[in-house]
């Protein structure tokens, strides 16, 4: 069942007489519980696509439907509610609050989500229950990224959006993070969408969307995606 549907979506930026089509007439759909990779070079439109799906921006043309709701028609307040209730975000840089402990960083989302899950349970799920009272500066990069994933999951989102989640990590830690994200799709029914320029990560995906110059070049379904351990780094 499709949880996400883009129909003829464009995002156009203007400056004087100049017009930039960051996305140009994009259409695709995604089923619930899939591990999706959006692949393309820098400037292809990947992050614009992710921002639109995450409710951080609105399309200039077309419609974006998530769980039956056309989010392209939502007001600013309604988009804020959508971001709080439906999507979780994981970025390349972890955006943890340095003066809060691990537990406090994760628990923080319970203040904006009415259906938040237990913070300790999410921290345990990412394997860092022993670090509840540590501050971000006391963690490795991989540990900080896992905490950012725990924080996103604590919101109990339908969709987990990840922008280059392994970009700042070494290969061993990157594999660990990808295993965790893959598990969220396979065993917890989350729709996980990863934006990356790393073609190796695409080998793990149920669906690969290739983007170039603001256009969808292909949407490929992979029947037998590789595990993170099988991908050559």
Predicted features along the sequence, with ranges:
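ABC family nucleotide-binding domain
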Residues: 2-211
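Conserved beta-strand-loop-alpha-helix hinge in the C-terminal portion
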Residues: 215-233
